């Protein structure tokens, strides 16, 4: 019990920061201004020198403290104005400031953790979204069961504020944060998903931080239980969840938690050293080598944690536990599954001969051709059947710019999908882009494709669509034709990919 309490207090003791005063520091909004794509956000009203000003932020905070302006309905948020600015404008400004300020203590903790673990030099590789695939290739071939879980969202923002108070000790800051959320109370109800979507679009950085913090909170509990399950004797979760009774303000939440979780459905620690957890975008994967009933225990743990701690509903029947060899899952724009390679080995012992069947598991990571064609069709590179079409909106650009745009898209997709087991789908996507580029240039010059290729030279035209991959590999490996040919067929994961391609959608 003491070890559990020490674990809970360790992270909390590092977060003795005072953030309230930073809200009134002009350089904080300068940082937000430099990170914002819309640079006109912090521009003063007509009559000023087009400089961002802290005055408009102070005006908004003053207004939020006025009782008659505390709550503003969503329907009137675009109509009401204050000194020439609407409420959406002020909300975006103050949310950018909140995002910058509240990220500071967590960034300091992350840097400290990386330095303690002596992995700061490798941090960039860990940030790569493709670093997950070598892990899957090394670990998942030894596992038997997998569960693909969608993380439930949205969550009530008041619960997030209460949890955030556990990590950062600054009452005035959270008082101001609550005022900001109350000013937009129509956007923080979980019943109105359209309002949540609107709120996230108006305040993308603030919304992203709240979501990441929510995921970090439930994962910290999960990681603690996972680490302790291998060397602790059987005991209940009650010791760990004592903090909920202290921080939960609503009485019905405490009663619900005590009744439905701690007593009737109390889970216990169990030894499962071969369980692996992977999170990506809004989903997570739980895989294990042991029997499925252990996976079922973790499944119910997640469900009751979300329902009782975060007060967000999750359906048990939406979380399925499947044999890994019979289940494929979507992961960062790839289709992934485990394929069984069966081979027969002849063994001879003295005068007896035996035929032994050997089953080798191999993970297959392939390019999903149909979702990619739908993305290309949505971007007007082809139709829904995958037939290339011209892109007239680019016809006003020069030939060099048109070719450069298509080449950049083709290279990015080739770079992103280089780890695929089968390259046939990738070659088809590159062919669609190549022919779409030719049709766009022919449309610009008011000519047919055949006449344009005849005039330009079909052999030399757009040859970079097929050579850029070999040129990149030749800079890394020896210029041996057999080596490059072998590497072009094998998987190569690039650990410099920090963002997914715009055409990649993990539905």
Swiss-Prot record:
Keywords, comma-separated and alphabetical: Chloroplast, mRNA processing, Plastid, RNA-binding, tRNA processing
InterPro entries named in the record: Domain_X, Maturase_MatK, Maturase_MatK_N
Any one GO BP annotation for this protein: RNA splicing
Subcellular location: Plastid, Chloroplast
Molecular function via GO: RNA binding
Pfam families on file: Intron_maturas2 (PF01348), MatK_N (PF01824)
Major location (coarse): plastid
Family: Belongs to the intron maturase 2 family. MatK subfamily.
Function: Usually encoded in the trnK tRNA gene intron. Probably assists in splicing its own and other chloroplast group II introns.
Protein name (record): Maturase K
Organism: Lens ervoides
Gene this chain is encoded by: matK
